[in-house]
Regions:
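Acidic-and-aromatic substrate-binding clefts and catalytic sites of carbohydrate-active enzymes
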Residues: 33-36, 57-66, 93, 131-135, ...
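Active-site mouth loops of central-metabolism enzymes
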Residues: 28-37, 92-107, 128-134
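Beta/alpha (TIM)-barrel catalytic core signal, keyed to glycine-rich beta->alpha loops juxtaposed to Asp/Glu
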Residues: 3-9, 132, 136-327, 346-361
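Active-site groove signature of glycoside hydrolases
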Residues: 114-135
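Conserved beta-strand positions
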Residues: 27, 56, 87, 124-127, ...
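Short, acidic/polar
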Residues: 34-46, 100-117, 165-170
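N-terminal binding-site loop/beta-alpha segment at the start of enzyme catalytic domains
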Residues: 1-83, 148
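Short acidic capping loops at alpha-helix termini that bridge into adjacent secondary structure
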Residues: 24, 79-83, 87, 120-124, ...
Length: 361
């Protein structure tokens, strides 16, 4: 018997300026991408909680992430039409054409990814990192070739600067190509500038979607590192998924820990939830978040994280304002030069928390 997501337990949002709908929580296997059992158990739990979006990359374990995801989908007999699968292309080896965003690597790369995933197509293919050496026209045309060949339905970017994404949109307009629909970006309570400030015009002009990664700041927003670094923590192996979050945290530990303790108090006293659940709820409360990717080293962590969906429903203006004051890192809003004053941040305008403008300059 085939399996599919339990849609009664989840909210679904349109991914950018497209007709594709994704669960507000998705699953990514950048953590423990070589663990077959963890992958199988995690996907099963995700489906039970309504998750329909599953993300991987050719670079996760140099292909093993795609292998384990494909194997699990097959073993669980997941209905292909009921889920949204994405992978990302950039680097798979050390040979000259094994990396970057040339037409050769993009077309050959996705064909090899599909073999590992045991799929005929992916719903979304991402450019995993920017490549300023390859002409942007070549990359945009290659992504369109994938769509024309039926190997992917949509394409997106990951960790691209706003100017390069804007250039991609303009190239697609000029050449009458299908533009990207989303950006996979790092966003959480402590990393806000890119999503809330740098991408502001992309959201307004192109309705760009987002697939958020590292919503817990590499686990720091669970609060488990306040007292000490646990022996079984991935930070003991200096593994923060390339986000540099651990160094940032340790360099400013006293300041971060003070905020974490206050946020923990808000979570427990106001919402009867964990700090991690509050942090996840805060991310999906932003209307510019299309989906938030969860990853866990244990299934019980994933199970606890899904409870954040109920916390998200309880976030009101007063709690959101209290969180803003605690974080005190609100990216600056646009400047109204007629009155020479700063407007509220885009996030706070969208959430109608428009009377608070504290934070960074």
């Amino acid at each position: 018997m085939s399996t599919k997501p339990d849609t009664s337990k989840m909210e679904y949002r349109y991914l950018g300026n497209s007709g594709l709908r994704v669960s507000v929580f998705g699953w990514g296997n950048w953590v423990n991408n070589q663990d077959d059992k963890l992958t199988l158990d995690s996907i099963k739990l995700c489906l039970e909680n309504g998750v329909n979006f599953f993300d991987t990359a050719e670079g996760y374990g140099l292909g093993t992430g795609e292998l384990t995801l494909g194997k699990a989908l097959k073993e669980l007999n997941v209905e292909r039409e009921k889920v949204v699968i994405s992978t990302k292309l950039f680097k798979i080896g050390d040979d000259p054409n094994d990396s970057a965003l040339s037409r050769k690597h993009i077309l050959e790369g996705l064909k090899n990814s599909l073999k590992r995933l045991q799929l005929d197509y992916v719903d979304i293919v991402f450019c995993h990192r920017p490549d300023r050496q390859t002409p942007i026209e070549e990359t945009c045309k290659a992504m369109n070739n994938l769509i024309d060949l039926g190997l992917a339905f949509y394409w997106g970017t990951s960790e691209w600067e706003s100017d390069l994404i804007m250039e991609a949109y303009k190239v697609c307009e000029e050449l009458k190509l299908i533009p990207p629909i989303c950006e996979q970006c790092n966003y959480n309570m402590f990393v806000r500038e890119r999503v809330e400030d740098e991408y502001r015009d992309l959201f307004k002009k192109y309705k760009m979607g987002t697939t958020i990664w590292s919503p817990l700041f590499s686990g720091i927003l669970t609060g488990k590192y306040i007292k000490e670094i646990p022996k079984d923590s991935r930070f003991n192996n200096n593994n923060d998924g390339g986000s540099n979050s651990f160094k940032t945290y340790m360099d400013n530990k006293k300041e971060y820990d003070a905020k974490l303790m206050k946020l923990k108090e808000i979570a427990e006293k106001k919402l009867n939830c964990t700090l991690a659940q509050l942090a996840l709820a805060w991310v999906i409360a932003n209307p510019d978040t299309s989906t938030c990717l969860l990853g866990a080293s244990k299934t019980n962590q994933l199970e606890e994280n899904f409870k954040a969906f109920e916390v998200y429903k309880k976030l009101d203006k007063n709690i959101l304002l209290e969180i803003e004051k605690t974080l005190n890192n609100t990216p600056r809003g646009e400047i109204d030069y007629r009155d020479w004053k700063e407007l509220p941040s885009r996030r706070n305008i969208l959430l109608d928390v428009d009377y608070y403008k504290g934070g960074s300059n």
